[in-house]
């Protein structure tokens, strides 16, 4: 759906509208709960601010620039990189467990990403790098958000949505020439409410209870659903590279799930 919206809305403006829509969706749930004492903790606020910058401001814009340059099915598959990056960052910076199977799984996912980018040449590599950088931003966001305990998931999502949405929309209005048509605005807000607001709120709930890497593994089924939607609902042609990449990435994600279950 975001690929369709990009035809009439610029990447910065669309990122802003998606996150503002997400904030609007969860706002009714954001006025109760949480810990006022923890919210005053400087470390908590710093982690949340970094999560807003990486996950709300930078990640969506990088993804949308990549989506504008590549088929939606390919971008959906590249999003599997987020699972790997989240696990690696959780190990490197947040001291979560990383075993040999997870390393092999990471190699399989990266191999799938390379296979997907190669047939498109330079344009494919550029699009793949943009999506990969978005996944790094979201990997940092996932780990930081899992450690923010003074805010409820709805409050965290609302803060991300309002903060990142306002910044990106302001940049879009300056760089991309004003607001898009009302159809584009309403469409982006509706998609944002469901795919960003409720999705992020539910993900944060899981991340705070399960840890960043485990919750990301469950979330990793969504890229494959995105591929099916791109093929069957939006009529994108399926390619051999996409089937091959899906095989590598599916094997990698399955291996990570097995490793996490046994651990």
Q: PLM ranges: what are they?
A:
Residues 1-2, 27-75, 79, 87, ...:
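Specific transmembrane alpha-helical segments of multi-pass solute transporters/efflux pumps
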Residues 5, 14, 18, 66, ...:
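Hydrophobic/aromatic residues within transmembrane alpha-helices
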Residues 7-58, 85, 137-141, 158-176, ...:
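Transmembrane alpha-helices of multi-pass small-molecule transport proteins
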Residues 8-16, 40-46, 113, 118-137, ...:
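Juxtamembrane helix-entry segments on the extracytoplasmic side of multipass membrane proteins
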Residues 15-17, 60, 74-83, 144-165, ...:
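Helix-helix packing/entry segments at the starts of transmembrane helices
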Residues 17-21, 50, 54, 81, ...:
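Hydrophobic residues within alpha-helical transmembrane segments
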Residues 26, 89, 93, 98-118, ...:
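Hydrophobic transmembrane alpha-helices of multi-pass small-molecule transport proteins
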Residues 42-52, 98-109, 128, 151-161, ...:
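Cytoplasmic-side transmembrane-helix entry/capping segments in multi-pass membrane proteins
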């Amino acid at each position: 759906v975001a690929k369709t919206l990009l035809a009439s809305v610029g990447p910065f403006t669309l990122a802003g509208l998606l996150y503002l829509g997400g904030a609007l969706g969860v706002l009714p749930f954001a006025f109760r709960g949480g810990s006022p004492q923890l919210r005053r903790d400087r470390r908590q606020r710093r982690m949340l601010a970094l999560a807003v910058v990486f996950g709300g401001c930078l990640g969506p814009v990088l993804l949308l620039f990549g989506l504008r340059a590549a088929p939606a099915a390919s971008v959906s598959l590249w999003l599997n990189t987020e699972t790997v990056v989240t696990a690696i960052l959780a190990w490197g910076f947040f001291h979560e467990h990383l075993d040999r199977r997870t390393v092999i799984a990471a190699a399989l996912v990266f191999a799938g990403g390379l296979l997907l980018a190669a047939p498109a040449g330079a344009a494919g590599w550029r699009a793949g790098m943009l999506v990969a950088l978005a996944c790094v931003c979201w990997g940092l966001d996932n780990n930081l958000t899992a450690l923010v305990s003074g805010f409820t998931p709805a409050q965290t999502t609302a803060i991300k949505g309002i903060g990142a949405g306002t910044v990106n929309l302001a940049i879009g209005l300056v760089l991309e020439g004003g607001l898009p048509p009302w159809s584009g605005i309403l469409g982006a807000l509706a998609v944002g409410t469901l795919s960003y607001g409720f999705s992020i709120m539910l993900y944060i709930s899981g991340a705070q209870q399960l840890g960043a890497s485990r919750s990301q593994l469950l979330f990793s089924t969504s890229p494959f659903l995105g591929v099916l939607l791109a093929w069957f609902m939006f009529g994108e042609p399926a390619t051999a590279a996409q089937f091959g990449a899906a095989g590598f990435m599916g094997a990698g994600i399955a291996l990570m799930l097995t490793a996490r279950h046994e651990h």
